[in-house]
């Protein structure tokens, strides 16, 4: 059984979700948000870094999935998001976690079955898949979705980052 950490990075709120991959599905372990307040950017990034390290030390996951930066209309927002991602990635790397990155579309596809799902649809599927009785905070829900996507990708025939598969004559070739 593998503990998986999902991170939904943000410069103001970073969501985290921890699930246990049993090999037959995932079980909810924990989720929450790291809130940075309204201080200077370097102070907020330090809070993200320390918060992610604390989650890692508390739950001891062996692998981490994190959302990739999307191109936002506001370049400044995209840069801040990228810096928050970097703080979270460094926290995971320092603890020797296996780290994988996913686009929002990949996460939605893995959890809701369509890359065009909205946040409410993703949250409902997260609740269904993890048998949650209460709605998690939206950033925590996104982080749980990332953890579920990572669990699904890790157990698929085509591991993350190894390219595409081709089929010839009914045989799968990597």
Swiss-Prot record:
Enzyme class: hydrolase
Organism of provenance: Pseudomonas syringae pv. syringae (strain B728a)
Binding partners and assembly: Homodimer which binds Holliday junction (HJ) DNA. The HJ becomes 2-fold symmetrical on binding to RuvC with unstacked arms; it has a different conformation from HJ DNA in complex with RuvA. In the full resolvosome a probable DNA-RuvA(4)-RuvB(12)-RuvC(2) complex forms which resolves the HJ.
Catalyzed reaction equations: Endonucleolytic cleavage at a junction such as a reciprocal single-stranded crossover between two homologous DNA duplexes (Holliday junction)
HAMAP family: RuvC
Main location: cytoplasm
Role description: The RuvA-RuvB-RuvC complex processes Holliday junction (HJ) DNA during genetic recombination and DNA repair. Endonuclease that resolves HJ intermediates. Cleaves cruciform DNA by making single-stranded nicks across the HJ at symmetrical positions within the homologous arms, yielding a 5'-phosphate and a 3'-hydroxyl group; requires a central core of homology in the junction. The consensus cleavage sequence is 5'-(A/T)TT(C/G)-3'. Cleavage occurs on the 3'-side of the TT dinucleotide at the point of strand exchange.
Similarity annotation: Belongs to the RuvC family.
GO molecular function: crossover junction DNA endonuclease activity; DNA binding; magnesium ion binding
A GO term from the CC aspect: cytoplasm
Residue positions of the active site: 8, 67, 139
Cofactor binding note of this UniProt entry: Binds 2 Mg(2+) ion per subunit.
EC number: 3.1.21.10
Binding-site residues, Mg(2+) 2: 67
Compartments (UniProt record): Cytoplasm
Binding residues annotated for Mg(2+) 1, in chain numbering: 8, 139
Keywords: Cytoplasm, DNA damage, DNA recombination, DNA repair, DNA-binding, Endonuclease, Hydrolase, Magnesium, Metal-binding, Nuclease
Cofactor(s) this protein requires: Mg(2+)
SUPFAM superfamilies referenced in this protein's UniProt entry, alphabetically: Ribonuclease H-like
GO biological processes: DNA recombination; DNA repair
Stated name of the protein: Crossover junction endodeoxyribonuclease RuvC
Spans through the membrane: none
């Amino acid at each position: 059984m593998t503990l998986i950490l999902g991170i939904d990075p943000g410069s103001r709120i970073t969501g985290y979700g921890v699930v246990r991959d049993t090999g037959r599905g995932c079980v909810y372990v924990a989720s929450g948000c790291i809130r940075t307040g309204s201080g200077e950017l370097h102070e907020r990034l330090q809070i993200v870094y320390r918060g992610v390290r604390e989650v890692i030390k508390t739950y001891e996951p062996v692998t981490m999935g994190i959302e990739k930066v999307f191109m936002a209309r506001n370049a400044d927002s995209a840069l801040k998001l990228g810096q928050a991602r970097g703080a979270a990635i460094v926290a995971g790397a320092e603890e020797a976690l296996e780290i994988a990155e996913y686009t929002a579309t990949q996460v939605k596809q893995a959890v809701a079955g369509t890359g065009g799902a909205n946040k409410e649809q993703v949250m409902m599927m997260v609740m269904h898949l993890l048998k949650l009785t209460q709605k998690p905070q939206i950033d925590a829900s996104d982080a749980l979705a990332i953890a579920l996507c990572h669990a699904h990708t890790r157990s698929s025939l085509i591991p993350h980052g190894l390219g595409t598969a081709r089929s010839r004559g009914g045989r799968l070739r990597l």
